[in-house]
């Protein structure tokens, strides 16, 4: 019942590169049908994926509310703190408003509209999608009452999770938690800046005054995030076990700068993206996960887009390094990475990361693959490929095919023949872990449901939820394609806004049957830009040198070899120091000397490397004959 506590697992910067897997064959492009396999009605699924957000609304519901079983809720949010925090979205199956995943949700909804707004319009859904973006953006304007103040949470996860109540009946804490210069949160402030920058583009043509308001808040939040650095879960410990910032704030600062460049064309933000790529990890980290915590692949795809569109300015060399990491992400999803970090697959072909809400990563990856493929294809034949470490280069069409196969799996083309989108197809989850959907609607029975009565009378019911949570995507199956439709099985049946937000973009793309209309290309940019002088780009200073085997022995018919290696900081004298250096070693067998096992993946150098310094390490490999050295690569580092 905790949030994506598994999203803690989400934050791995992931082992990259790995074992080749076979890309599952995919079904035809535009299709009709229901959950259970074969062809799918992407337009219907798109409509439902957007409709779901109306079930997650907090605050005073509008007159055009389509989810009729919901009513007003959270009407005193922020009152005790002297600020109006009414509105926004509940994150998943509970009644807390967590700012971090909500901001990522708004970012991905806005990006979906920007890339595939024309397809949404053709399906009659663009207005609904823009309403969904605005519902979140309006809340973040309220949550940012001063340049260096941001409210990041309303409610308390601990007290909320001991209650099972409709949001309309809430009796749990509605305390609000904030960031300020004494309590910084660069990750949360950076992601909120990103959401508002992306949302400003959505409304640039239809409501320029509102768009400018969003952009002003975005700029202030970015400056706040950059000037007062720190992790938001250190300033707001109450959030740590629900939506902890495990990847740190470097990705959000780069993410925000990239989106502000997209929204303004102001070279200040492009310079920031380029000049901080090493220090904040954008050019160093390569990962196979993308979600509410880890934004690096999103930054890298966006940087690649700038490069492909000729918007790199003097920073083409640095943006190419970003693009190489975007390629690593794509290749890892395709099973064409190298070194042991490909995304796993279930027997039925679903990309698989973890048991808790795995589909959040599937929808996020599918969106990035589709967007990256479309921009590669738009750039021309010579650039419409991704070069992978293991296996032949991948065409843009392969990325789209993979994204489509994952969406088809979610909609029912899977071994169980079940749609993991509630309300789509004949077979779908009937007992989603969701308080509002699982208790009789307050409109049907206005009798108060207490904290404990909800558990006693509704949570444990064997029957289907009384209210249809139409369009919600649940956590999904396990690594063997297994799924138990039980309300208490929150790892598989809980829904989340960030599962749906990227999916709506992919569904629009598939419903349109072709490449995105790139709606943002027609949006008029402000012309009062301030151009700052560029700073020089630099190549990565970290270098690994593999040495010969230093020892060899046999055991149980296998040969073992110990190999030595050195890692060096090639920065010139007086240059920057390398810290938090993470190194990947492909399948060592035995101890590793000179490095420490990292908390989640790979190994970490226990000390920093000043300019010109080197450090030695060693590892063991085994084989039938004389085993060669393992693949060794730099996962990431910081320059200080």
Curated annotation (Swiss-Prot):
Single GO term (MF): carbohydrate binding
Tissue: Expressed in roots, leaf sheaths and flowers.
Active site: 94 (nucleophile), 433, 485, 494
Localization in the cell: Secreted
Alphabetized InterPro entries for the sequence: 6-hairpin_glycosidase_sf (IPR008928), 6hp_glycosidase-like_sf (IPR012341), CBM_49 (IPR019028), Glyco_hydro_9 (IPR001701), Glyco_hydro_9_Asp/Glu_AS (IPR033126), Glyco_hydro_9_His_AS (IPR018221)
Glycosylation sites: 528, 548
Major localisation: secreted
Family, similarity comment: Belongs to the glycosyl hydrolase 9 (cellulase E) family.
Keyword terms: Carbohydrate metabolism, Cell wall biogenesis/degradation, Cellulose degradation, Glycoprotein, Glycosidase, Hydrolase, Polysaccharide degradation, Secreted, Signal
Enzyme class: hydrolase
Signal peptide: 1-24
Name of the protein in question: Endoglucanase 1
Entry EC no(s): 3.2.1.4
Annotated Pfam families: CBM49, Glyco_hydro_9
Catalytic activity line of the entry: Endohydrolysis of (1->4)-beta-D-glucosidic linkages in cellulose, lichenin and cereal beta-D-glucans
An annotated GO cellular component: extracellular region
């Amino acid at each position: 019942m905790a949030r994506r506590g598994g999203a803690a697992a989400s934050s791995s910067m992931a082992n990259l590169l790995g074992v080749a897997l076979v890309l599952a064959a995919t079904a035809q492009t535009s299709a009709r049908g229901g959950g259970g396999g074969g062809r799918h009605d992407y337009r219907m699924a798109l409509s439902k994926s957007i409709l779901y957000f109306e079930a997650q609304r907090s605050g005073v519901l509008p007159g055009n509310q389509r989810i009729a079983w919901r009513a007003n809720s959270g009407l005193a949010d922020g009152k005790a703190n002297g600020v109006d925090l009414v509105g926004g979205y509940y994150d998943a199956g509970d009644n807390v408003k967590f700012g971090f995943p909500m901001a990522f949700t708004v970012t991905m909804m806005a990006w979906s509209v920007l890339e595939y707004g024309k397809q949404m319009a053709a399906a009659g859904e663009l207005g609904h999608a823009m309403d969904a973006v605005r519902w979140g953006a309006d809340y973040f304007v309220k949550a940012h009452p001063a340049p260096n103040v941001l409210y990041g949470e309303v409610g308390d996860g601990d007290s909320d999770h001991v209650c099972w109540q409709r949001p309309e009946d809430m009796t749990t804490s509605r305390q609000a938690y904030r960031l300020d210069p004494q309590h910084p949160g660069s990750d949360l402030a950076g992601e909120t800046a990103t959401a508002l920058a992306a949302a400003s583009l959505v409304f640039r043509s239809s409501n320029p005054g509102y768009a400018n308001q969003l952009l002003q808040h975005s700029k202030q939040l970015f400056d706040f995030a950059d000037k007062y650095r720190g992790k938001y879960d250190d300033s707001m410990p109450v959030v740590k076990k629900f939506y902890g910032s495990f990847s740190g704030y470097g990705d959000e600062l780069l993410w925000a700068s990239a989106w502000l460049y997209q929204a303004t064309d102001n070279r200040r933000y492009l310079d920031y993206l380029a000049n901080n790529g090493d220090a904040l990890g954008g050019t160093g980290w390569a990962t196979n996960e993308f979600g509410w915590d880890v934004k690096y692949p999103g930054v890298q795809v966006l940087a690649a887009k700038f490069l492909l569109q000729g918007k790199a300015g003097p920073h083409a060399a640095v943006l190419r390094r970003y693009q190489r990491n975007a390629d690593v992400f794509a290749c890892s999803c395709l099973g064409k990475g190298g070194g042991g970090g490909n995304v796993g697959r279930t027997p039925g072909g679903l990309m698989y990361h973890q048991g808790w809400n795995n589909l959040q990563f599937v929808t996020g990856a599918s969106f990035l693959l589709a967007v990256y493929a479309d921009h590669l294809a738009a750039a021309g034949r010579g650039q419409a490929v991704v070069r992978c470490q293991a296996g032949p280069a991948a065409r843009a069409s392969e990325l789209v095919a993979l994204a489509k196969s994952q969406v088809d799996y979610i909609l029912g083309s899977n071994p169980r023949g079940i749609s993991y989108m509630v309300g789509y197809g004949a077979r779908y989850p009937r007992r989603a872990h969701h308080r509002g959907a699982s208790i009789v609607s307050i409109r049907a029975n206005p009798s108060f449901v207490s904290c404990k009565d909800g558990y006693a009378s509704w949570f444990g019911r064997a029957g289907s939820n009384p209210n249809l949570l139409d369009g919600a995507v649940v956590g999904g199956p396990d690594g063997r394609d297994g799924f138990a439709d039980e309300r208490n099985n929150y790892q598989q049946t809980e829904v989340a806004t960030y599962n749906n937000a990227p999916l709506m973009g992919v569904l629009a793309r598939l419903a349109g049957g072709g490449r995105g209309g790139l709606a943002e290309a027609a949006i008029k940019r402000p012309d009062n830009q301030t151009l700052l002088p560029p700073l020089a780009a630099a190549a990565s200073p970290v270098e690994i040198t593999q040495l010969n085997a230093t020892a060899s022995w046999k055991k149980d018919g296998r040969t073992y070899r110990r190999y030595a290696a050195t890692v060096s900081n090639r920065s010139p004298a007086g240059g920057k120091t390398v810290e938090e250096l993470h190194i990947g070693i492909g399948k060592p067998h035995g101890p590793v000397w000179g490095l420490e096992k990292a908390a989640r993946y790979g190994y970490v150098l226990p000390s920093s490397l000043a300019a010109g310094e080197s450090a030695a390490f060693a590892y063991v490999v085994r084989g039938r004959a004389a085993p060669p050295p393992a693949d060794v690569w730099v996962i990431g580092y910081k320059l200080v």
